[in-house]
Amino acid sequence: MTLAGIFIGGGLGAMLRFWLGNVITAKTKGLSLPIGILTVNILGALGLGIFTGLHVANASVSLIIGTGFFGAFTTFSTFSVETIQLLMAKRVKESILYIVLTLCGSLFAFWCGWTITI
């Protein structure tokens, strides 16, 4: 049952990431950073922070939402690909900014989400 829930939660998270990332990317065309995945990762960290701060006692629910949904909604692999693409295009300043914004923004968003629920 838990594995099926993680599968479903992961599928929903991945579909939402795909949709939202594409919507944001389309609306921010021409900017020098991949804003779609940056936004998705920060929102995902905020959501996971809120969820973690709620201290859900049911282990299955925690796995389905935390590991499944938020694990699939956020994406370190796409962040890595986009960073390397920026570097290969010799856009070093943009790649450094993207790394800093993603890591610091995600950590801060998680902390904010977690803090407001405790």
Curated annotation (Swiss-Prot):
Q: Which InterPro entries match?
A: FluC
A single GO molecular function, which one? fluoride transmembrane transporter activity
Q: Which UniProt keywords apply?
A: Cell membrane, Ion channel, Ion transport, Membrane, Metal-binding, Sodium, Transmembrane, Transmembrane helix, Transport
Q: Which GO terms describe its cellular component?
A: plasma membrane
The known regulators of its activity are described as:
Na(+) is not transported, but it plays an essential structural role and its presence is essential for fluoride channel function.
The residues that the entry says bind Na(+) are G71, T74
The primary location reported for this protein is membrane
Tell me, what does this protein do in biology? Fluoride-specific ion channel. Important for reducing fluoride concentration in the cell, thus reducing its toxicity.
UniProt name for this protein: Fluoride-specific ion channel FluC 1
Higher taxonomy: Bacteria, Bacillati, Bacillota, Bacilli, Bacillales
The coding gene here is fluC1
